[in-house]
Amino acid sequence: MSEKTAVVLLQMGGPDSIAAVEPFLFNLFSDREIIKIGPALLQPFIARFICRRRAPKVEAYYEQIGGKSPIRELTEAQAKALETELGDGYRAFVAMRYWKPTTIDALAAIKREGISRVIALSLYPHYSRATAGSSINELKRVLGQAGVSFQVSYIDRFYDHPLYIKALAEKVEEGLSEFSDRSRVTLVFSAHSLPQSFIDDGDPYLSHIQATVRLVMERLGNIDYHLAFQSRAGPVKWLEPSTEEMMKRLATEGRKEMLMVPLSFVSDHIETLYEVDIQYAKEAKQLGIDKFRRSPSLNSSPLFIECLAELVKSVKGEG
């Protein structure tokens, strides 16, 4: 067996074509760790019905951002940069929860290379059973069926890692540089929403998000800021306020310059490229907000890659 260590980057994934939108949505809505729709035996059938109805609308969103999600290419670029940062002795792989390359694909590639030591690194900074939890459980399921023995370690959160906070603050500063007077700017941290029931059941996601915001603001200093939640889906109670509600409230208060800071996303995909850049930008204009911008995503930011490398080395005992 190879003495190298495999680092598996766990990410949500996204459709790589318009034709892939409906099957991607089916994979998402079939996952009972993220959403429970009826009895377990019926969920695939209900998910199929929901996806057929939702797909045309979602396909139109993807048409506006180039006909696919860029998340695979961006995550593979992160993997390549991480491999370079870590140096000899490491190989980085990508495992997408709801599309390709799948967890099975990643483990098959690791097996072909004869690697037995695996570090699974969730690219969700803030732990939730619906995101990092689901990806790790999928990895464990596949490992149980792999027919080969891997020595596996897991990294399931890094919401307060100093280099993550520094990288995020750096991107906010980049966004602020587009405004002539930062004292006039309102920051809106926009995190992916989650059903309130998850938090009520003890999921730490909200507390992790709040900690990240607090730590970033400690670096940025005295700037007006707010936290809101985007990407709701379905009739259940979600975390509040929604990003749209927050924008309306701030516009009513006379705020004219706004910088949106995506949280819980470490690379660009539909939540940043469509929801923020197109949908929220249009709403901002309708609300009378004169200047609306988004801070750049982390993607392969050198500081962020350094953060991931430190996380890996801390597990390996090299930190």
UniProtKB/Swiss-Prot annotation:
InterPro entries: Ferrochelatase, Ferrochelatase_AS, Ferrochelatase_C, Ferrochelatase_N. Pfam families: Ferrochelatase (PF00762). PROSITE patterns: FERROCHELATASE (PS00534). GO terms for molecular function: ferrochelatase activity; metal ion binding. One of its GO terms (biological process) is heme biosynthetic process. Fe cation binds at H192, E271. Its main location: cytoplasm. Pathway: Porphyrin-containing compound metabolism; protoheme biosynthesis; protoheme from protoporphyrin-IX: step 1/1. Catalyzes the ferrous insertion into protoporphyrin IX. Belongs to the ferrochelatase family. This is Ferrochelatase. The lineage of its organism: Bacteria, Pseudomonadati, Thermodesulfobacteriota, Desulfuromonadia, Geobacterales. The gene is hemH.
